From Swiss-Prot:
Family: Belongs to the paramyxoviruses W protein family.
Annotated spans, Disordered: 45-179
Protein name: Protein W
Biased composition regions of type Basic and acidic residues, renumbered to the chain: 65-74
Bias type Polar residues, positions: 75-101, 108-117
InterPro entries per UniProt: Soyouz_module
Cystine bridges: none
Species, as recorded: Newcastle disease virus (strain Chicken/United States/B1/48)
Length: 179
């Protein structure tokens, strides 16, 4: 098994931290949606602001800067020490509205998604029940449903079939019982 010196281990941690940060902040192709958006109209500003705030918050990097570790041993931890250098220091007054906004956005997304899902399920069930009942709210008749009626209000095809059945000769009952 290979052994590493403390300097090599520190270098590996630093390199892996840099790689992880690059992966997290990498910009890929944005996801494309097909069909209607799940976000209700008028809510995009709130969601955009929440997303931008969420994207600007990064986890603390405790081993990036050795000076920072020395200071943390001497002084109690403050929000400024855990904040990355490239973003402005966060105050405790900024955090609760962000959390409340994030929770509100999550609730809106869940509620909106579940409401739209329920609405679509209702529409599908109504369509299927209407298809079963027929156009006039009653069960469909067996056979041809879209027929044209003649001037007497009778389906000419059905009338022809009835006439054929009446005029056809039937075999005797004994013969029918054998088949």
């Amino acid at each position: 098994m290979a052994t590493f010196t403390d300097a090599e281990i520190d270098e590996l941690f630093e390199t892996s931290g840099t790689v992880i940060d690059n992966i997290i902040t990498a910009q890929g192709k944005p996801a494309e949606t097909v069909g209607r958006s799940a976000i209700p109209q008028g809510k995009t500003k709130v969601l955009s602001a929440a997303w931008e705030k969420h994207g600007s918050i990064q986890p603390p990097a405790s081993q990036d800067n050795p000076d920072r570790q020395d200071r943390s041993d001497k002084q109690p931890s403050t929000p400024e020490q855990t904040t990355p250098h490239d973003s402005p220091p966060a105050t405790s007054a900024d955090q609760p509205p962000t959390q409340a906004t994030d929770e509100a956005v999550d609730t809106q997304l869940r509620t909106g998604a579940s409401n739209s899902l329920l609405l679509m399920l209702d529409k599908l069930s109504n369509k299927s029940s209407n298809a079963k009942k027929g156009a006039h709210g009653r069960a469909p008749k067996r056979g041809i449903t879209n027929v044209r009626l003649n001037s007497r209000g009778v389906n000419p095809v059905a009338e022809t079939v009835r006439k054929d059945r009446r005029t056809k000769s039937r075999p005797p009952l004994e013969t029918r019982a054998q088949t």
